């Protein structure tokens, strides 16, 4: 299972289905996240949380044993294509942001479902790890 920024942010902020998402992470076998996605997680949460809360998030990620996967050339090519095909401004209903494309690319490369929140990825060819 690949983990998108939206799932982490939803859990941390206590959004709808946060408990279900957290349970999926606890029960997951070898969850993964792109290293590029981790940058996005930190950027998004740094604007919303105090430093001590950010450290709590880091501990949670460690507890969930999410493997950070280096962002490589293959992922870069897939993410670039995804942005052209599904990105904001493309006219496609997915309207993925750049960070979404990093998660999309890793899910494609690894042929694994993506844990996300929202209605953007549902308009792509990625399989979902969770349906609320």
Where are these regions (language model features)?
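Short, well-structured N-terminal submotif of metal-dependent ribonuclease cores
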Residues: 1-33, 46-59, 130
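Acidic, PIN/NYN-like endoribonuclease modules and their adjacent C-terminal/linker elements
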Residues: 104-132
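A generic structural signal for short hydrophobic patches within well-formed alpha-helices
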Residues: 8-9, 38, 121-122
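Glycine/charged-rich beta-loop-alpha catalytic/anionic-binding loops adjacent to active sites
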Residues: 20-23, 59-62, 84-90
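Active-site neighborhoods of divalent-metal-dependent phosphate/nucleic-acid chemistry enzymes
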Residues: 67-113
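Short loop->beta-strand "edge-of-pocket" segments that line small-molecule binding or catalytic clefts
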Residues: 29-32, 64-69
């Amino acid at each position: 299972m690949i983990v998108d920024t939206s799932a982490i942010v939803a859990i941390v902020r206590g959004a709808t289905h946060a408990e279900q998402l957290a349970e999926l992470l606890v029960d997951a076998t070898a969850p993964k996240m792109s290293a590029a996605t981790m940058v996005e997680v930190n950027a998004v949460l740094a604007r919303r949380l105090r430093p001590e809360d950010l450290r709590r998030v880091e501990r949670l990620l460690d507890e969930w044993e999410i493997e950070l996967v280096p962002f490589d050339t293959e992922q870069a090519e897939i993410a670039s294509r995804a942005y052209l095909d599904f990105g904001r401004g493309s006219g496609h209903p997915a309207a993925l942001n750049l960070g979404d494309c990093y998660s999309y690319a890793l899910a494609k490369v690894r042929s694994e479902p993506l844990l996300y929140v929202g209605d953007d990825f549902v308009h792509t060819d990625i399989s979902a790890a969770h349906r609320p």
